[in-house]
Amino acid sequence: MAQVINTNSLSLLTQNNLNKSQSSLSSAIERLSSGLRINSAKDDAAGQAIANRFTSNIKGLTQASRNANDGISIAQTTEGALNEINNNLQRVRELSVQATNGTNSDSDLKSIQDEIQQRLEEIDRVSNQTQFNGVKVLSQDNQMKIQVGANDGETITIDLQKIDVKSLGLDGFNVNGPKEATVGDLKSSFKNVTGYDTYAAGADKYRVDINSGAVVTDAVAPDKVYVNAANGQLTTDDAENNTAVDLFKTTKSAAGTAEAKAIAGAIKGGKEGDTFDYKGVTFTIDTKTGDDGNGKVSTTINGEKVTLTVADIAIGAADVNAATLQSSKNVYTSVVNGQFTFDDKTKSESAKLSDLEANNAVKGESKITVNGAEYTANATGDKITLAGKTMFIDKTASGVSTLINEDAAAAKKSTANPLASIDSALSKVDAVRSSLGAIQNRFDSAITNLGNTVTNLNSARSRIEDADYATEVSNMSKAQILQQAGTSVLAQANQVPQNVLSLLR
């Protein structure tokens, strides 16, 4: 090896090795002080890129876990509000069951409806005011996406539905609305109600007064209806003519009638005080005028004495063919029982509803007048109309009954099948609550999975970028020793050119 002064190759070699050990020592100290194996891309370019992607995933998944917890909070808030809505619906159902009981008075129903209305208004208030972080969760249909992953599209959707009185089908829910008026309602709810029912017996039509029961013909100028005394048929005649008995007439008979000759013959052949029978009647000879047949006979009818006078038979006449007969009273045969009567007519009884029914009369519609207005009722009396519109009975604020038509009643009439309506509303609330409960369980599962993923990613990133202290301490010790050795050797290498000077002495 040449002895030179200008170039100290040993020193240069030693310096180079010393720089290497210095770099190794610097790297080891940096890793030990930071705890990271990769402090910059130069430490491990590929590893740094991989670790950075892991960091992005870890941070994204950690935030996603917080998002999922927010999703649980939203679901819990919504479900809590729905629970209160459910409680109100249950109370409304309880009140509706009470309202359907027929023992309730009008004031009872009003009190029940007042509480139902308050409960329904509370449902709307809960719907409008329940919110999470400024978002109203029940006031409208909405789909809320919760980011539960570190990448696009990794979401879980919470289906929020509008839940209020209208969406539950309970808008206008009423258990104390107007009810269809009946004839019975009109009679019991109003004063001075008048009118009539119509009946038809064949081609004949009749009216029956709803208050007095009087029967008249169904006409513009109605006639009173009677029951015929002879045959029980309906008639407008108030009496039936009885049959006059020829034997008893106050007008003198024609000469030689059978009755006159028979009575004259009895007088002629008898004496005063004798009795005889004729046509089922027993007569007594009161007066005998001569022996020609003239005279008077009497009998008792219905407790009254009736005298028959025979006259106009000539004195010494050979027969009684010229006899005439005259009664002190007119006597008739009753058309009802065939008995003798002094009445020329038998009075017919006024017809009643039972008489119409006995004649197979069929009931038709009715005309009912309330407060000056005439209403029409159907044959069964359970439907009242005016100008073709069904009438309902309603109550004013002071509790006074009033009649309104179907148009006015539509907005306030009682809900048909109220219990079924509430059950439907409860089912809808239950369905939404079930959905929210399921989504909470899903979020719990997502949070658990995110936690596992973050743990595994942290472990993977640690293996790439975290410093292995055992290795790095060993590297630092090695570098320190090399530094010490290099420094010492460099000092000796720097002394080598001094040896060349010895050649110059």
From Swiss-Prot:
It is found in: Secreted; Bacterial flagellum. One of its GO terms (molecular function) is structural molecule activity. InterPro entries: Flagellin, Flagellin_C, Flagellin_C_sub2, Flagellin_N. GO terms for cellular component: bacterial-type flagellum; extracellular region. The keyword Secreted applies. Pfam families: Flagellin_C, Flagellin_N, FliC-like_3rd. The keyword Phosphoprotein does not apply. Keywords: Bacterial flagellum, Secreted. PANTHER family: FLAGELLIN. Flagellin is the subunit protein which polymerizes to form the filaments of bacterial flagella. Belongs to the bacterial flagellin family. Individual Salmonella serotypes usually alternate between the production of 2 antigenic forms of flagella, termed phase 1 and phase 2, each specified by separate structural genes. This is Phase 1 flagellin. It comes from Salmonella naestved. The gene is fliC.
